[in-house]
């Protein structure tokens, strides 16, 4: 089992720390809000960074979306692109997949899948998952906001600097 083979992710992987979050969010500031000062930007987004830092942490692929999933010849799911893996918010990969930049999913389906994921964590004996559904959904939305701000910054950088506008579609 993949999860069991990880051992202690916290000891083996870099942590998705506040400073790492700021590094990623700065991509958004630099490429989407170049006239906003770093001080003003940090003042605006500090509550997001602090809130994300409080979400329980687990192994985080960090680039878990449809283009990194493969159907292997054995009809098993293959996952690629692990080089960015970290120890971070438990909902980060879930939101990366369910609110994938390349696929539009129905909100009702997303809500059901988030609830199902939370129940699986509870069934696995993970005490931190025993929070109100609204709180778990809040963790999901916060991680999604941070991730998508980073993605918007990266996609805008690809458009402006690298002349690759297709990512913005």
Listing of model-derived features with the role each one plays in the protein:
Residues 1-36, 55-57, 86, 167-168:
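A cross-family kinase active-site recognition segment
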Residues 2-3, 46-94, 104:
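Active-site acidic catalytic loop and adjacent metal/ATP-binding pocket
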Residues 11, 15-22, 66-71, 86-88, ...:
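Glycan-recognition and catalytic cores of secretory/periplasmic carbohydrate-active enzymes
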Residues 19, 65, 85, 104, ...:
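Short, solvent-exposed segments of well-ordered alpha helices
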Residues 37-47:
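Central P-loop NTPase core of STAND/AAA+ ATPases
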Residues 161-169:
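Regulatory N- and C-terminal appendages and interdomain linkers associated
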